[in-house]
Amino acid sequence: MTDKIIELKNVTFRYDENQEKPTLNNISFHVKHGEWLSIIGHNGSGKSTTVRLIDGLLEAESGQILIEGHKLSEDNVWDIRHKISMVFQNPDNQFVGATVEDDIAFGLENKGIPLKEMRERVVEALNLVDMSDFKTREPARLSGGQKQRVAIAGAVAMRPSIIILDEATSMLDPEGRLELIGTIQKIREQYGMTVISITHDLDEVTLSDRVLVMKNGQIESSSSPRELFSRGDELLDLGLDIPFTSTIIKALRQIGFTFDNRYLLEKELEDKLWALISKK
């Protein structure tokens, strides 16, 4: 069995056959089982198009997409979709149930899950995202963060191999974003799911195993978060903010402190500062 759960080989895509420049131009990359891959890049770089191709919502002009070793095609697209759950930027567009628990059960009913198992999955999913107390609420009456947690609960209840988050945290306040990212991390650890996250959020990127940078429909780079953050001011051109520790290090350099070019986590920066101060 291959360790690649997703693989794209020389994939090209156009929304319109008369489109001179393809939206995606001969891209190739893979995602490993259980990996958290963040995809970043400016609007129009091809991020959302890529994940919609993986889920079979769009069809590639050329190239191959393999999910768990199976080439995605018209014949198996529905089977492939059962392995993947997507959570979008605006959860209101995904709600169909009158209550939170009804909404989570909807996808399970369509899948033909027996009633007893369905109830167990709904309870488990709500507990996992800390929304059990809201099970009889109308989704429309929830806060933005609560809605996204319900959307994630619905995705998890389907027991997919892969969860795709298409800017799922972008409309939340900082506290709601951190809570949701923590929930995703907990789900990943508990179920060993593969996570693909389209994001501009530094906390999300930091938690990922690998970061794919997309630019003009192509793969600009693939690296660890630490390697990416070491690129300094280039991050602004990639649609990311400068990490807090990088800003502090830049200011300290200006007053005479010496640092190498390696990106430091907050704890590492704290230890480095204590070491420098103790030498004074």
UniProtKB/Swiss-Prot annotation:
GO MF assignments: ATP binding; ATP hydrolysis activity; ATPase-coupled transmembrane transporter activity
What is any Pfam family matched here? ABC_tran
- KW Cell membrane (keyword) present: yes
> Mind telling me which InterPro entries this protein's record contains?
AAA+_ATPase, ABC_transporter-like_ATP-bd, ABC_transporter-like_CS, ABC_transpr_CbiO/EcfA_su, ECF_ABC_transporter_ATP-bd, EcfA_1, P-loop_NTPase
Q: Which residues form the ABC transporter domain?
A: 6-241
Q: What is the protein's major site of localization? A: membrane
Top-rank taxon of the source lineage equals: Bacteria
Localization per record: Cell membrane
Q: Keywords on this record?
A: ATP-binding, Cell membrane, Membrane, Nucleotide-binding, Translocase, Transport
The membrane topology term of the UniProt record is:
Peripheral membrane protein
The EC code for this enzyme is 7.-.-.-
Q: Where does ATP bind?
A: G41, H42, N43, G44, S45, G46, K47, S48
Task: Kindly state one GO CC term assigned in the UniProt record.
Answer: ATP-binding cassette (ABC) transporter complex
Q: What class of enzyme is it?
A: translocase
What does it do? ATP-binding (A) component of a common energy-coupling factor (ECF) ABC-transporter complex. Unlike classic ABC transporters this ECF transporter provides the energy necessary to transport a number of different substrates.
The family classification in the record reads: Belongs to the ABC transporter superfamily. Energy-coupling factor EcfA family.
Question: What is said about its interaction partners and assembly?
Answer: Forms a stable energy-coupling factor (ECF) transporter complex composed of 2 membrane-embedded substrate-binding proteins (S component), 2 ATP-binding proteins (A component) and 2 transmembrane proteins (T component).
This protein's name: Energy-coupling factor transporter ATP-binding protein EcfA1
Native organism: Streptococcus mutans serotype c (strain ATCC 700610 / UA159)
Organismal lineage: Bacteria, Bacillati, Bacillota, Bacilli, Lactobacillales
